[in-house]
Swiss-Prot record:
Main localization category: cytoplasm
PROSITE patterns: B5, FDX_ACB, TRBD
GO CC annotation: phenylalanine-tRNA ligase complex
GO MF terms, alphabetically ordered: ATP binding; magnesium ion binding; phenylalanine-tRNA ligase activity; tRNA binding
Biological process, per Gene Ontology: phenylalanyl-tRNA aminoacylation
Catalysed reaction equations from the record: tRNA(Phe) + L-phenylalanine + ATP = L-phenylalanyl-tRNA(Phe) + AMP + diphosphate + H(+)
Record keywords, A-Z: Aminoacyl-tRNA synthetase, ATP-binding, Cytoplasm, Ligase, Magnesium, Metal-binding, Nucleotide-binding, Protein biosynthesis, RNA-binding, tRNA-binding
Protein name, UniProt field: Phenylalanine--tRNA ligase beta subunit
Subcellular location: Cytoplasm
Enzyme class, UniProt record, top EC level: ligase
Recorded superkingdom: Bacteria
FDX-ACB domain boundaries: 701-794
Complex formation: Tetramer of two alpha and two beta subunits.
Length: 795
C-alpha cells in the first residue's frame, strides 16, 4: 500500500521526522518498502492566471499568452499545451526558476515571440508522467502563491508491505491508528456527520446469500452533476496514493477506500431494475465488466444483480451496464460487508485483482459501512450536489463476525518475551489499541476489535504487546535452557553405527518421500493394505509407504536412467502399516532397507567385473547383524514373497518372529518398475536389532590352535547355517571358530545332496591339545550332525 505522509499527519502528527516515522512503522510490523518525494526538486514556480491567450502568428501549435503571477506586470509566455486558454489558473515557472534536472528558466524568444517563463505540466515538475497538457488549478487558487506551498508538495509517498492478517492497515485511518498507539497520541478523525435526507427515494434490497453478505447498504442520491471537477486536494491525495483521478464519482469512492478502508461502488440508478439482489451467480451467466471484458460467471461467485441479471461481481469489479457515465443523473451508492471466504480466490478465478477484492478477501471492518456511506455522501453532495435519500440496509446479525474474547496469562507473556512488563503497562497498551480488557487472577481477558480479524489466540495478544512496547525495549537475554543428559545404555546400538557399517561397504544413504505412488507400491506389496491420503500432493504421492523399498527402488531407476548401473543404497525411516489396534489406526515402524544392483566390485584394472548376487547382500546384512546382540540368533529361512524371486528370497527370523526379509527382485517386478538387470533388496525392523554386544574381556589362549576341515554330505534342502549352529552347540568351549568355505554338488555326491566343506578351529586356554582331545571334539560334532541331519563325511 502507498500513502501520503502529509495525509497521515492530518490524522496524527508525532514529533518525528520522516525517517523516524518510517522506522516506527517498520517496527510496528508494517514494513516500509520505499519512500519517494511526491514531486521533483524545483523552485520559482507560482500560481498564475492566463489573462490573454492568442494564436502564435508563426506557429499553429503555439499560443502567445499574458500571465498574471501577482507581479507589477503581466508576463509574456509562449505555450504549446492544447489546454491553454484564457482564465485558466496554472503552475507558472518564472524567470530564474530551476526545474527538476537542473533546468533553468530564462527569458527567450520562441519563433520570434518573447517568452518570460513556462507554463508547466505534471511531468515537468516531476509529479507524474502526465504530459498531455499544462496543470489546471481551481479557479480559487491564489495568484502569486508559491506552487509548492499551495499543493503542500514537501511531502513523501511511503509504500508499505502488509502481511495478509493486517488488512486493518490498508487505509489512512488504520496506519494513523497504529502510529497514534505507538506515540501515545490521540487520532484526529475528520468530522463525519449524518447527511440530511432531502429525498424520499428508497432502494429495495433483497439479500439472498446472507452468509456471504451479512450487511448491505444502498443510498440514492438524485440530480448529481457527474461532470463537476474533482477538487485538486482530492486529486493530489489520490495521486500520492498511486490512484489516477477519473471522475468525481469514482474519485470519491476511491478516496473513501483509501481514507477509511471501506470499498464502495456507485451504480447509475436509471440502469437498475429494482430490487437490487445479492446472490450467487447461476452457471453460464455473463457480465460485461467496466473494462469492457466479458466474464463467464461461476456458481461460487457472489454478484450484485437486478431483475435483468448481474450488475457487478460483489466486492471485485463493477459491470459496464450499470456504470456511471457522463449522462448519469441519479446514482446509488453501495457499501457492504462481504465475508472474506466468499471473496477469497474469486478474483483470481477470472484473472483479476482489484483494490476492493484485496481488502474484502482479507477482511473489512464490519462496523464501518454506515460511516463510509455518510463520508461518501457528504463528499458527493459537496462536489456534485444532489438530493440525498435515506440509507437502506439489510443486515443479518447471525452471520456477522463475532468479537473474540481471548485470555492472556501473565506466565505465558513473561515466558515468550523473556521479559517482565508491568501489568499496568500491558493493560494500557490494550486500551490504546482499542481492545476492551479486564485483568483478574494473573489473566487478561481481551475482546478483539471489529477491525482486527487476526486476534484469535494468546500468542496474537503477546505479539501486540511486543509491537507496541517495542522490540528494542526488550533486553537481549541468552536463552535459558535446563538441559539434562540423555540416558544412554551401554547396550544400545546407535543407528549411526549401522549406517557407518554400510557406508564402509560402499553403500550410500538415501532419503526418500514417505508419500509414494500406490501403483508402484502394489507391485511390491500387492496384498498389503495401504493408507491413502485424502488430499495428496499429486496422484504419484497419494499413499503412505508400507515399505522403504518403494522409494529406494525408484531411486535405483533414477540412477540407472543416468548411466549409473552399479547402485548401492540404504535408508532408515518409518513405514506406515494400517492397524486398527494402533493409535489413529496406523502402526509406525522404524525400519532399515537396502538395495543393490550391478557388479560386485567397483571397476578396477586388477579385478574382473562380476555381477553381485543374493549372497553378497546377505553377507553385508550378516556383517551388520554381527554388531547386534541378536546377531548369533538370527536365521535366514527360505520363504517366498510376491515381489521376490521364488528361489532367492528368505525371511529374516529372530526367536521365531519374522523381523525382515531379503531376496532378489522378481524379474517381472523389476520390469514393471523399469529396473535393468538383477536387483537385490532387504528390509528389517530396527527395534528388533537395537541392542549390541557389550564388550566382554576374555582370556586369549597362549596355546596353539588346531584347524580341521570336514566335507559333509547332507540333503540339499538343509541350510548350512543349521549345520554351523549345531557344531557350536555341541563342541563346547574348545571350538573357537566354525566357517563354511565351500559348497559342492556334482560327481561323487548323490543326487539331491550337497557337500558342505566346513572349517573347525579348536583351542584350549589351559593346555596344548593332544590329538585325542581334538578327535574327541570332532567325534562329538560328527555324531550330532549324523543324528540331527543324517550327515556323513564325503569320501
Amino acid at each position: 500500500m502507498k500513502f501520503s505522509e502529509q495525509w497521515v499527519r492530518e490524522w496524527v502528527n508525532p514529533a518525528v521526522n520522516t525517517e523516524q516515522l518510517c522506522d516506527q512503522i517498520t517496527m510496528l510490523g508494517l514494513e516500509v518498502d520505499g519512500v519517494e518525494a511526491v514531486a521533483g526538486e524545483f523552485n520559482g514556480v507560482v500560481v498564475g492566471e492566463v489573462v490573454e491567450c492568442a494564436q502564435h502568428p508563426d506557429a499553429d501549435k503555439l499560443r502567445v499568452t499574458k500571465v498574471n503571477v501577482g507581479g507589477e506586470r503581466l508576463l509574456d509566455i509562449v505555450c504549446g499545451a492544447p489546454n491553454c486558454r484564457q482564465g485558466l489558473k496554472v503552475a507558472c515557472a518564472i524567470e530564474g526558476a530551476v526545474l527538476p534536472g537542473d533546468f533553468k528558466i530564462k527569458k527567450t524568444k520562441l519563433r520570434g515571440q518573447p517568452s518570460e517563463g513556462m507554463l508547466c505540466s505534471y511531468r515537468e515538475l516531476g509529479m507524474s508522467e502526465d504530459h498531455s497538457g499544462i496543470i489546471e488549478l481551481p479557479a480559487d487558487a491564489p495568484v502569486g502563491k508559491d506552487f509548492r506551498e499551495y499543493l503542500i508538495l514537501d511531502d513523501k509517498e511511503i509504500e508499505i508491505s502488509l502481511t495478509p492478517n493486517r488488512a486493518d492497515c490498508l487505509s489512512i485511518a488504520g496506519v494513523a491508528r497504529e502510529i497514534g498507539v505507538v506515540n501515545q497520541l490521540a487520532v484526529t478523525e475528520p468530522a463525519i456527520n449524518p447527511v440530511p435526507v432531502t429525498s424520499d427515494e428508497k432502494v429495495a434490497i433483497n439479500v439472498l446469500a446472507p452468509e456471504a453478505c451479512p450487511r448491505y447498504l444502498l443510498r440514492s442520491v438524485k440530480n448529481v452533476n457527474v461532470n463537476a471537477e474533482t477538487p485538486v486536494w482530492m486529486k493530489e491525495k489520490l495521486r500520492r496514493c498511486g490512484i489516477r483521478s477519473i471522475d468525481p464519482i469514482v474519485d470519491i469512492t476511491n478516496f473513501v477506500l483509501l481514507e477509511l478502508g471501506q470499498p464502495m461502488h456507485a451504480f447509475d440508478a436509471a440502469k437498475l431494475a429494482q430490487p437490487v439482489q445479492v446472490r450467487f451467480a447461476a452457471d453460464g451467466e455473463e457480465l460485461v465488466l467496466l473494462d469492457g471484458t466479458t466474464a463467464k460467471l461461476q456458481s461460487n461467485t457472489l454478484v450484485i444483480a437486478d431483475q435483468t441479471g448481474p450488475l457487478a461481481m460483489a466486492g471485485i469489479f463493477g459491470g459496464q451496464a450499470s456504470g456511471v457515465n457522463a449522462q448519469t443523473k441519479d446514482v446509488i451508492l453501495e457499501a457492504a460487508f462481504f465475508a472474506p471466504l466468499a471473496i477469497t480466490g474469486r478474483a483470481r478465478q477470472y484473472g483479476l485483482h482489484t483494490d476492493s477484492s484485496h481488502r474484502f478477501e482479507r477482511g473489512v471492518d464490519f462496523e464501518l459501512q454506515h460511516k463510509a456511506m455518510e463520508r461518501a455522501t457528504s463528499l458527493l453532495v459537496e462536489i456534485c450536489g444532489g438530493e440525498v435519500g435515506e440509507i437502506c440496509e439489510v443486515v443479518s446479525e447471525t452471520h456477522l463476525p463475532k468479537l473474540n474474547k481471548v485470555q492472556l496469562r501473565r506466565s505465558k507473556l513473561d515466558a515468550l518475551l523473556g521479559h517482565h512488563i508491568e501489568t499496568e503497562t500491558v493493560t494500557e497498551i490494550f486500551h490504546r489499541l482499542g481492545l476492551p480488557v479486564s485483568y483478574e487472577n494473573e489473566v487478561w481477558t481481551v475482546t478483539s476489535a471489529s477491525w482486527r480479524f487476526d486476534i484469535e489466540i494468546e500468542e496474537d495478544l503477546i505479539e501486540e504487546i511486543a509491537r507496541i512496547y517495542g522490540y528494542n525495549s526488550i533486553p537481549n537475554n541468552a536463552p535459558l535452557a535446563h538441559l539434562s543428559m540423555r540416558e544412554h545404555h551401554e547396550s544400545d546400538l546407535e543407528l549411526s553405527r549401522i549406517k557407518l557399517a554400510l557406508v564402509g561397504n560402499d553403500f550410500h544413504e538415501a532419503i526418500t518421500y514417505s508419500f509414494v505412488d500406490p501403483k508402484l507400491q502394489s507391485i511390491l506389496h500387492p496384498e498389503q493394505a495401504v493408507w491413502i491420503l485424502p488430499n495428496p500432493i499429486s496422484s504419484e504421492m497419494s499413499a503412505m509407504r508400507v515399505s522403504l523399498l518403494t522409494g529406494l527402488l525408484g531411486a535405483v531407476v533414477y540412477n540407472q536412467n543416468r548411466q549409473q548401473n552399479r547402485v548401492r543404497l540404504f535408508e532408515t525411516g518409518l513405514r506406515f502399516i494400517p492397524d486398527e489396534s494402533a493409535e489413529f489406526g496406523i502402526r509406525q515402524e522404524l525400519v532399515f532397507a537396502a538395495v543393490m544392483t550391478g557388479s560386485r566390485l567397483s571397476e578396477h584394472w586388477a579385478s574382473k567385473a562380476e555381477p553381485a548376487d543374493f549372497f553378497d547382500l546377505k553377507g553385508y546384512i550378516e556383517n551388520l547383524l554381527s554388531l547386534t546382540k541378536a546377531g548369533p540368533y538370527i536365521k535366514f529361512v527360505a520363504k517366498e514373497f510376491p515381489a521376490f524371486h521364488p528361489g532367492q528370497s528368505a525371511a529374516i527370523v529372530l526367536d521365531g518372529e519374522e523381523i525382515g526379509y531379503i531376496g532378489q527382485l522378481h524379474p517381472m517386478a523389476a520390469q514393471k518398475l523399469g529396473i535393468n538387470g538383477k536387483a537385490f533388496a532387504c528390509e528389517l525392523i530396527v527395534d528388533k536389532v537395537a541392542e549390541r554386544n557389550v564388550a566382554n574381556a576374555k582370556e586369549i589362549s597362549k596355546f596353539p590352535a588346531n584347524k580341521r576341515d570336514l566335507a559333509l554330505v547332507v540333503a540339499e534342502n538343509i541350510a548350512a547355517s543349521d549345520i554351523l549352529d549345531a557344531c557350536r552347540e555341541v563342541a563346547g568351549s574348545k571350538l573357537t571358530q566354525v566357517n563354511l568355505f565351500d559348497v559342492y554338488q556334482g560327481q561323487g555326491v548323490p543326487e539331491g545332496h550337497k557337500s558342505l566343506a566346513i572349517s573347525l578351529t579348536i583351542q584350549d586356554t589351559e593346555k596344548t591339545l593332544e590329538e585325542d582331545d581334538i578327535n574327541a571334539v570332532i567325534s562329538v560334532v560328527l555324531s550330532e550332525l549324523k543324528d540331527r541331519f543324517n550327515a556323513y563325511l564325503r569320501d
